[in-house]
Amino acid sequence: MFEGPVQNLIDELGKLPGIGPKSAQRIAFHLLSVEPQDIDRLTAVLVKVRDDVRFCTVCGNVSDDERCRICSDTRRDASVVCVVEEPKDVQAVERTREFRGRYHVLGGALDPLSGIGPEQLRIRELLSRIGERVDDVGITEVIIATDPNTEGEATATYLVRMLRDMPGLTVTRIASGLPMGGDLEFADELTLGRALTGRRTMV
């Protein structure tokens, strides 16, 4: 254990996902060795993220405005919505350059053991979007692109059950090919692109 501010910094860094005690200590001592202006720059960026970044009121993606860049782009196909778990998954799909529709970010996946049920996710907002016209365009297809793990599959099954009786709506699921138990964000562009192109109809 170190003393005072150094240990406090290590403790706070250790709370970040994927950062263990040794990594936290290494980062802390790196920060102690850099120029003061570098620390000031990092601090300013963190404060700006805290103050300026919000969630898009339409899709739930991160944004610095009410509507994110994708929802504001009139060239995107508003009739097709890709449902993902987290904002990082939006970036994973965007990297494939295979999808020109819009997104809906759930904010997680169903996980009863962790206390995450449908009420904790943005499922109600998805149903509302489907029931209304956005930019004078109705949604005709929902692509479910949750992670290929237990929670993601449970979420996909629940969504299919909620959406299957909606008239004029096609519900699809990205094709198999992604490793079971993996995350969308770690899939390479080619594999994820093929999974999107080869999506299968559920309803």
Swiss-Prot record:
Record Pfam families: RecR_C (PF21175), RecR_HhH (PF21176), RecR_ZnF (PF02132), Toprim_4 (PF13662)
Zinc finger (C4-type): 56-71
Official protein name in the record: Recombination protein RecR
SMART domains xrefs: HhH1, TOPRIM
Segments crossing the lipid bilayer: none
Function of the protein: May play a role in DNA repair. It seems to be involved in an RecBC-independent recombinational process of DNA repair. It may act with RecF and RecO.
BP-aspect Gene Ontology terms: DNA recombination; DNA repair
GO MF annotation terms: DNA binding; zinc ion binding
Family named by the database record: Belongs to the RecR family.
Annotated ranges, domain Toprim: 79-179
Keywords: DNA damage, DNA recombination, DNA repair, Metal-binding, Zinc, Zinc-finger
CDD domains on file: TOPRIM_recR
Species assigned in the record: Mycobacterium leprae (strain TN)
PROSITE patterns in the cross-refs: RECR, TOPRIM
